[in-house]
C-alpha cells in the first residue's frame, strides 16, 4: 500500500503513474492530437545493434513535432569502433547527416513516415513505423528494419502545472551499419509535454525534480526464440512502474516495483541494479563493459546513459541479441527515497 510522508497539494498525486499496453498503428504514430493536456513533443527512434565482432552501434534521432519544442541536437550516432574502449559519439558521421529541424510527415497505408527535407544539407534520412514493422535509414550510414515486439507501452504522469504522456514500441531489427551486418533492437518512442516542454530538459516532471533512480527500456531475444522486453522506471515518492512483454505479446504491468542501484565511489555510471517486481520477482541490470556513453555527460541529457542487459536473477537461457539503454543519476540516489549527492 502506498504511503504519503509528504502531503500533496491539490492536483499533485505524489508521482503516481498509470501504465498500460496500447495498440500501436501508423495512424496513431502520425496523429498530432494531444492527450490529457500535453502536446506531442517529438518522436524518438533509438536503439542498439551489434555486429559479428561484438562491436556496438547506438543511435537516436529527435524527430520534432509541429506542436513540440525542437532539440538543439538532432542526431546522435555512437559506436565502440571510435576508440575501441566504449561507446563514443562518431562526430564526423553525425555531422554528415541532415540536421532536420522539422521533417516531412506522411501516412501511407498504415505506416507513419518521417523524412529529411529535399535539398537540405547533409545525407537524407527516413523513418517508417507502424504496429507491425519499422525501417530506419540514414543514407550511407545505416539501414535497419524489423518487426514489432508485442504491443506498445503507454504511461501517464500527472502534475499540477504540467505532466507527461509517453509511448514506446519496440522492434526486433537487423540490417547494416557502416556496411557491416548487424542485429539488435530499436524503440520508437513519443513524448507528450506541456507547451515549451522537452523530455529530460524543460517541464519534465521526472528529470527536473530529480526523481528517478533507474529508467531503462530493454529487450532480449534468446536463442530459443523467447523474448523478455519492456521498461523499468523507479524513483522517489511513488514514481515507478514495470512494463513486461514476452514473445507471445502477453503484457504484465505494475507500479509495485523497487530497485537498488550500485555504483563505485565517484562514478556516475551504474555498476549493477537489483530490481524487485511486486515484492518477489527479481531482475538485474548487467552493464556492458563497453556500454558507457561518456560523451553524453554534461550535455542536453543530464543523466549518465549506458548500454547493458536485463535478466531475471538466476536466468539460464542464452541471449542472442539485446539492448538495454538505461540511465541513472547518482545525484538522485540509489533507491526509492534514498537520496544522492550533488557532487
Predicted regions span which residues?
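Targeting-peptide/extracellular-domain and disordered-appendage signature
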Residues: 1-343
Amino acid at each position: 500500500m502506498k504511503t504519503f510522508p509528504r502531503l500533496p497539494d491539490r492536483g499533485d498525486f505524489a508521482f503516481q503513474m498509470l501504465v498500460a499496453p496500447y495498440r500501436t498503428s501508423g495512424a496513431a504514430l502520425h496523429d498530432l492530437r494531444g492527450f490529457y493536456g500535453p502536446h506531442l513533443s517529438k518522436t524518438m527512434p533509438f536503439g542498439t545493434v551489434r555486429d559479428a565482432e561484438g562491436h556496438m552501434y547506438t543511435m537516436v534521432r529527435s524527430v520534432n513535432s509541429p506542436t513540440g519544442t525542437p532539440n538543439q541536437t538532432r542526431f546522435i550516432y555512437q559506436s565502440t569502433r571510435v576508440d575501441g574502449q566504449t561507446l563514443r559519439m562518431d562526430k564526423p558521421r553525425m555531422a554528415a547527416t541532415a540536421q532536420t529541424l522539422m521533417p516531412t510527415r506522411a501516412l501511407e497505408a498504415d505506416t507513419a513516415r518521417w523524412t529529411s527535407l529535399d535539398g537540405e544539407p547533409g545525407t537524407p534520412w527516413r523513418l517508417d513505423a507502424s504496429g507491425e514493422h519499422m525501417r530506419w535509414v540514414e543514407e550511407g550510414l545505416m539501414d535497419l528494419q524489423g518487426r514489432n515486439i508485442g504491443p506498445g507501452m503507454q504511461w501517464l504522469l500527472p502534475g499540477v502545472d504540467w505532466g507527461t504522456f509517453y509511448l514506446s514500441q519496440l522492434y526486433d531489427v537487423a540490417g547494416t551499419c557502416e556496411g557491416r551486418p548487424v542485429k539488435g533492437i530499436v524503440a520508437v518512442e513519443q513524448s507528450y509535454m506541456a507547451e515549451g516542454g522537452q523530455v529530460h530538459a524543460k517541464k519534465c516532471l521526472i528529470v527536473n525534480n530529480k526523481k528517478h533512480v533507474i529508467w531503462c527500456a530493454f529487450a532480449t531475444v534468446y536463442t530459443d526464440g523467447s523474448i523478455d522486453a519492456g521498461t523499468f522506471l523507479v524513483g522517489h515518492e511513488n514514481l515507478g512502474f514495470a512494463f513486461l512483454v514476452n514473445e507471445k505479446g502477453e503484457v504484465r504491468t505494475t507500479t509495485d516495483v523497487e530497485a537498488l542501484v550500485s555504483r563505485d565511489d565517484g562514478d556516475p555510471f551504474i555498476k549493477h541494479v537489483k530490481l524487485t517486481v511486486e515484492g518477489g520477482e527479481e531482475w538485474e541490470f548487467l552493464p556492458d563493459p563497453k556500454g558507457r556513453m561518456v560523451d553524453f555527460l554534461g550535455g542536453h541529457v543530464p543523466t549518465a546513459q549506458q548500454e547493458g542487459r536485463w535478466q531475471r536473477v538466476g536466468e539460464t537461457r542464452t541471449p542472442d541479441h539485446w539492448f538495454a539503454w538505461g540511465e541513472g543519476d547518482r545525484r538522485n540516489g540509489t533507491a526509492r527515497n534514498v537520496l544522492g549527492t550533488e557532487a
